[in-house]
Amino acid sequence: DQTRGWFYSQLAAGVIAFGRAPYESVLMHGWMLDGQGQPMSKSKGNVVEPGKVVKEHGADALRFYLLKTSAPWEDIPFQMDGVKNARKTLNVLWNVVNFATTYMAIDSFDPQRVTRDMAKPHLNQEDAWLISRTEKLKNEFTRQVNALELHKAGRALEQYILDDLSRWYVRLIRDRMWSEEGDAEKLAAYRT
């Protein structure tokens, strides 16, 4: 129905109105499956209303769950626990951002005043490690998105958030945040 209905309607309307297709390519998943592996259907009564999921867990959690769950061309086995876990991952990211911005605000940190070159001599091993991991993630994520392997890109991002950023880096630098304002190693962590 999506292929015949929405995609074709958009294609026909775009060509008639503007003389060109409104999209270059279309990427779509297979069926949305219920907990028993059956395709969701209103007539079967096994549909999960997206609005209810968004209201309870947020749109970003639902999007992130759908992104990382299955290859775009495969069926998606919908599990509410998966959406909950996606929300937890995003909350971890939010907490990391909150941790960093709280200390940066206390110290009136301005990234325009502390350049990478100024911070580089004061990087600790964990700072250099996170910079390396971030660069690796950026390259891997870009390659996977370009290859339309969105599920792999989403999973790599999740692993980076939970393992590299939260479980390792934040724990390793936590004590440095108690250093005096202007401490070079603390500023290097901020810059990281």
Where are these regions (language model features)?
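Long, charged, mostly alpha-helical binding arms that flank functional sites
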Residues: 20-192
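Short, conserved micro-motifs enriched in small and acidic residues
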Residues: 1-7, 156, 191
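Metal-dependent nuclease catalytic cores in nucleic-acid-processing enzymes
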Residues: 3-19
